[in-house]
Amino acid sequence: MEALQKQQAARLAQGVGPLAPACPLLPPQPPLPDHRTLQAPEGALGNVGAEEEEDAEEDEEKREEAGAEEEAAEESRPGAQGPSSPSSQPPGLHPHEWTYEEQFKQLYELDADPKRKEFLDDLFSFMQKRGTPVNRVPIMAKQVLDLYALFRLVTAKGGLVEVINRKVWREVTRGLSLPTTITSAAFTLRTQYMKYLYPYECETRALSSPGELQAAIDSNRREGRRQAYTATPLFGLAGPPPRGAQDPALGPGPAPPATQSSPGPAQGSTSGLPAHACAQLSPSPIKKEESGIPNPCLALPVGLALGPTREKLAPEEPPEKRAVLMGPMDPPRPCMPPSFLPRGKVPLREERLDGPLNLAGSGISSINMALEINGVVYTGVLFARRQPVPASQGPTNPAPPPSTGPPSSILP
């Protein structure tokens, strides 16, 4: 008994020290069903068991107290850091931790306009309630995009739809002090405005609707395609546009071939010329149409072939004078017949086609042609049709070239 009291006194003197020696006393306790079994026997053994149980309870209490002290010490250390961390404190306790001004400080400090803060707070609050919050500061040209100034500039010009229709994005770019060398500045500004500001414009100003915005974007896209098409000259020919009085179908495109059922002038061609009378600047279209031209169309009289065209141009002016006057006002026409070309412009061969149009028996396969209009020289090659001439038109045809056989074969 005295030995146990000495051990107890030694434990109390050590303070928290008895934590280690108390551990070996715990394992032998589980076999005991209850502490009442220790009180059943009367005598020294019962007193010893009761004292050991009391010692164990005291050790547990001391351990709990030590753990509570350690937790209090840990809480006292990060106490200064607690208010600064937004995750450990609810937003309601520290509202300044979650203001838009601190999250988007760069936007609020762009200038000292007193209405800037009010506008940005209202904008961010509206986007938050709408379900599309602004999560980052918009950047353009490596600098912060001023949403306040952009909204004021666009709404001052009538809203986003009006700016798109009038194409005044360059003025908006200058108003934002952005570099003028930005590529596709209009598209970038329109995209940023639609993402951050257009819903707010519809809510506060009601200058347009999403349907009108989509229609303006589609119209702008179609106009861009049309400008790209008209900016490319056909066949690379330079010259002023044709006069309004002339048929627009008389452009540089090749005329359609004549039909087989009509022996007269081609009715499908808007210029009134048969397909074989068109002088093409490139030989490829003629080669493609050789197989589709019937033989009777090759020997048509020039008067029938060129009559409608002479009536269209000017009945009171000669063809040569008309061709000279056509230079400064009309562009060159690939389908112009050779008889309308001014004299002196065909260096290799110059003759009027007063008889039937027949190049098959003349022995000439091609004619080089040069035409100067407004100081620009256009050159091309005319290819002949190599088909046999019908016998019925023999008397009206020019004399055939000498035969390739021996000279004695053509003597009487």
From Swiss-Prot:
Subcellular localization(s) per the UniProt record: Nucleus
Keyword terms of this UniProt record: DNA-binding, Nucleus, Transcription, Transcription regulation
Keyword Transcription tagged: yes
Biased composition (Acidic residues): 50-73
Residue ranges of every copy of the REKLES domain listed in the record: 304-389
Subunit structure: Interacts (via REKLES DOMAIN) with NPM1; the interaction mediates ARID3C nuclear shuttling.
Annotated function: Transcription factor involved in monocyte-to-macrophage differentiation. Forms a complex with NPM1 to translocate to the nucleus, acting as a transcription factor that promotes the expression of the genes involved in macrophage differentiation, such as STAT3, STAT1 and JUNB.
Name recorded for this polypeptide: AT-rich interactive domain-containing protein 3C
Species per Swiss-Prot/TrEMBL record: Homo sapiens
